[in-house]
Amino acid sequence: IKGLTQLLKKKNAYNVVEKHLSKYKGKTIAIDTSILLYKYRYGSGNDQLSHIYGILGKCMSFLSNGVIPIFVHDGEPPEEKSEVLSKRTDQRTKLNNKIEDLKIQIREYTTDSDSEDDGLGKLKVSLSKLEKQVVRVSQIHRKEVFYLLKLLGLPNFVAEGEGEAGCVELQKKGIADYVYSEDMDVLTFGCTRFLRASNKKDYYTEISLNDILSNLEMNQDEFVDLCILCGCDYTSTIRGIGPKTA
């Protein structure tokens, strides 16, 4: 949801209280695995094991604090999201084309000059920045994490649709106490207790949907309408309407 975090903070819709993971000892937390994969793959460059190390670290963190994790993986995306997925594919293609162009310029620059100067240095910096923007999460990465968790004996499954929606479904059924994600979209699915990672190691910000609805003086349906007006992956935006005007 575009600008939702900033909007909720501006309206003081929830209290930002950070808790150490140990405070959730004995609790079950459904984890949006896709979010973690992108987090660990971001800026990893040629490191093909960053997602493995990252997931292992997360498992150790949860288990050592007595927390039971359930890893939920993305299934097939809903049809409503096809347009935004197509746009993202186009953006990645354009970004990859820019990267290839820069690589060609660097090769030509190196061939024409025996020494590095400011021009070549700037090209390399630009290339590095662009490469970090291309987050590569392949089906191989997803399968590796799935089988790693299976070998560790930890509960993990593929949702029917998106992983975040699957996490919320587990909470609604009483299987999970909390949902861990970095995506505020879980609130629109009706996630009542939502955890986001803090900048401090093993600390999390707990967000209560009931607090948000109470402070905004809205019910769940009205909140979902607000999120749609802000802009989401499932519908086109309305011209002139966004987080500030919704």
Name each model feature, range by range:
Residues 86-246:
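Extended two-metal-dependent nuclease catalytic cores across DNA- and RNA-processing enzymes
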Residues 1-104:
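Non-catalytic, usually N-terminal nucleic-acid engagement modules in DNA/RNA processing proteins
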